[in-house]
Curated annotation (Swiss-Prot):
It comes from the Eukaryota. The gene is Naa11. Residues 209-218 have a biased composition (Acidic residues). This is N-alpha-acetyltransferase 11. Belongs to the acetyltransferase family. ARD1 subfamily.
Length: 218
């Protein structure tokens, strides 16, 4: 199983995976909006034959009154590949990319109040916390939990890894690191391109799933 950054030619298969797994679906232009605006943030899981079996579609929010933060638009894993930890791996990879590319401080998502499997995954495994309830968020009138995950712990871990990597190269006498080519810990989290605009879709940031498997969240 391989987790990698999504490419433009993956978007149709990501949409197909979404249609198979979830009741909340999106037009292809919305996938392109994410892929072109934040190409670093969306990831796919592919099997040994290169077929997409899961994905995470993510973006950065653009609120001038808040700290930099990302948002998970959709997360899904096909039923045939659930309970392998793919949802957690996809989520962690997207969160890491938010930190490294845009200096994100937290990541948010929405989930149906009735989706107990998703709530369990987000709360108990991924350390999300409910921030508020949004009444009638979904098209069928169901309320949504707005949830947030603080990324400070992951940021600290990435900094530690960077320091260890730098020290290892210094011990080995690498000419590249002796010349100071590695960034310092803070530089790894500086924003690079946070300038894209929202497409205006109001009901496209839900994260929910119709099954009881933990790895099928979207």
């Amino acid at each position: 199983m391989n987790i990698r950054n999504a490419r433009p030619d993956d978007l149709m298969n990501m949409q197909h995976c979404n249609l198979l797994c979830l009741p909340e679906n999106y037009q292809m232009k919305y996938y392109f909006y994410h892929g072109l605006s934040w190409p670093q943030l969306s990831y796919i899981a592919e099997d040994e034959d290169g077929k997409i079996v899961g994905y995470v579609l993510a973006k950065m929010e653009e609120d001038p009154d808040d700290v930099p933060h990302g948002h998970i638009t959709s997360l899904a894993v096909k039923r045939s590949h659930r309970r392998l930890g793919l949802a957690q791996k996809l989520m962690d990879q997207a969160s890491r990319a938010m930190i490294e590319n845009f200096g994100a401080k937290y990541v948010s998502l929405h989930v149906r109040k009735s989706n107990r499997a998703a709530l369990h995954l987000y709360s108990n495994t991924l350390n999300f916390q409910v921030s508020e309830v949004e009444p009638k968020y979904y098209a069928d009138g169901e309320d949504a939990y707005a949830m947030k995950r603080d990324l400070s712990q992951m940021t600290d871990e990435l900094r530690r890894q960077l320091v260890l990597k730098k020290n290892r190269y210094v011990v080995l006498g690498s000419e590249e690191t002796q010349g100071g080519t590695l960034p310092d810990a803070g530089e790894a989290c500086l924003p690079k391109n946070p300038t894209s605009k929202d497409s205006g879709s109001s009901d496209s940031t839900d994260v929910q799933d119709s099954s009881e498997d933990l790895d099928s969240i979207s």
